[in-house]
Amino acid sequence: MTTDASPPLQRAESLRAFKIRAVIVHLACLGVFFVPLTSTVLWTAVALYFVRVFSWEAGSHRYFSHRSFKTSRTFQFILALLAALSGQRGVIWWATHHRAHHKYSDVSPLDQHSPRFHSLWHAHFGWLLSQRALDTDLTQARDLARFPELVWLNKYHYLFPLGLLIATFCVGQYTAFFGATGLGASAVVWTFFVSMVLSQQAAFLLNTGLHGVEPGWFRYRRFATQDATTNAWLLAIPILGGAFHNNHHRYMNSARSGFYWYELDLTYLVLKILSWLRVVWDLVPVPQDVLDEGRKSKGHALPGNP
């Protein structure tokens, strides 16, 4: 059952509460200097980093923001839940801001992520520091707001990272999963806080590292889009293919950001496997004319300032 009865504006927690939580999350990462580290803790942190990146790249980004593939309502909720566990708020909130980013990308101050119109600090993280940015305008994502479970999860997204934090501590403290008992603090610091903060920074880097920076030895600009985006092959693995950002801005509805075989897009590879299993389907391809355009390209400089 879906509904259209949701109020147009979903209020978030207070800005003060958000700031306090953000400070705590980042300060907690300093715990790496005070807790023991086992190989199991480290590899679990690495694995959860990639799970978190996949959750927002495949879920919040390609599915909820751009509808680049289809899936069941059950798996849709699983994607939304995983995205909440990444610490990037609810998927409706994520999609409304990202759709606005594409609408005004690097051509208007309304693109809150653009380093062309705002400071690097504002484009990277500072844009979050207002009550307006934290609230969710459900009218900007009516296709998602018709699902009451997504609206609920969007409002109470913080409950799930909190539950994961508690579970992580209990597993580390009272079981030998990480190599010994008594590793609750280590597990929390590394597999929860460090893993989550790094995955968040990877998302923020798409705004400040791949917008408005001239092409260089690891950045290239295949398409002459109106925005100032580039691709960054060096970040392909850490961001699971999301770093082919100029490609994405040329055709944002595709299920893949690495348009060619040599552009490693691990998110798309996972989606392809899931499509073979019929968990997802109707992956939107890159149109042939766009592929041909890219093959003929010899690279482009950034557009002039608007």
Task: List where the protein language model places each region.
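Non-catalytic, topology-defining segments of multipass membrane proteins
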Residues: 1-205, 209, 253-306
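Pore-loop/selectivity-filter region of tetrameric P-loop cation channels
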Residues: 53, 88, 131, 236-247
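Active-site-proximal inter-transmembrane loops
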Residues: 143-150, 216-244, 251
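Intrinsically disordered, low-complexity coil segments
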Residues: 174-186, 212-230
